[in-house]
Design a protein with these regions (language model features):
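ALDH superfamily catalytic-core signature
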Residues: 1-101, 164, 210
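Conserved C-terminal structural/oligomerization subdomain of aldehyde/semialdehyde dehydrogenase
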Residues: 43, 76, 92-210
């Protein structure tokens, strides 16, 4: 549920949406099957339709860009399990398995659409290495029943925010919000805003005892 929320919300057009999914090889088959099952049940349609759960992208141009990015990912070794079709500004919810860690989408190519690229790993250190091999670093998330391991990974991610066992775009107004590397300069949030808008001045009084 959290994976779909983090990827499909607003048709995947969110800056801090979950865009790459790193799954341990021992869980990849089960994870992929569950995601495909959930995604296949999503009703696509217009926002005015109360039963619709997934709308179109912001424009047909944006959908065409997603189409090209998916095609590139397949060319680089990924395999479409479900979806992969465009209809005007609509793009079907898509799952791409077997994505190699050398693929563009595993590094710096961000897909702003309803696409779940699945990249497998063997060890925790390998997962951290793949996650950090990007010039971007806004948000990330970690799913694990091992809290010690989860906090270790969260602290190791080169990003401005990390959510444990939840979608990556969790945000509360009092939290500092910002990224590392190419993902912005500075942070937003109540205290961050106060600090940003506060001008400090030092006044020194000398020779007071003369």
């Amino acid at each position: 549920e959290e994976v779909l929320w983090g990827r499909m919300y607003n048709t995947g057009q969110v800056c801090c949406a979950s865009k790459r999914f790193l799954v341990h090889k021992s869980r990849a088959e089960e994870f992929t099957a569950k995601v495909v099952e959930k995604i296949s049940a999503i009703k696509r349609g217009m926002p005015a339709d109360e039963d619709s759960r997934l709308g179109c992208l912001i424009s047909e141009k944006a959908a065409i860009e997603v189409e090209h990015q998916v095609a590139l990912t397949v060319k680089q070794g990924g395999k479409i399990i479900v979806g992969g079709k465009r209809d005007g500004a609509f793009y079907d919810p898509t799952v791409i398995a077997d994505v190699p860690k050398t693929a563009d989408v595993a590094k710096d190519m961000e897909i702003f659409g309803p696409v779940v690229p699945i990249i497998t790993f063997d060890t925790t250190e390998e997962a951290i290495e793949i996650a950090n091999a990007s010039k971007f670093g806004l948000c990330g998330c970690v799913f694990s029943v091992n809290m010690k391991e989860a906090f270790y990974v969260a602290n190791s991610l080169e990003c401005g925010g990390a959510v444990i066992n939840g979608a990556s775009f969790f945000r509360s107004f009092e939290m500092p919000f910002g990224g590392y590397k190419f993902s912005g300069i500075g942070t937003e949030g109540v205290m961050s805003t106060f600090n940003e808008m506060t001008r400090t001045k030092s006044v020194v009084l000398k020779n007071i005892l003369k």
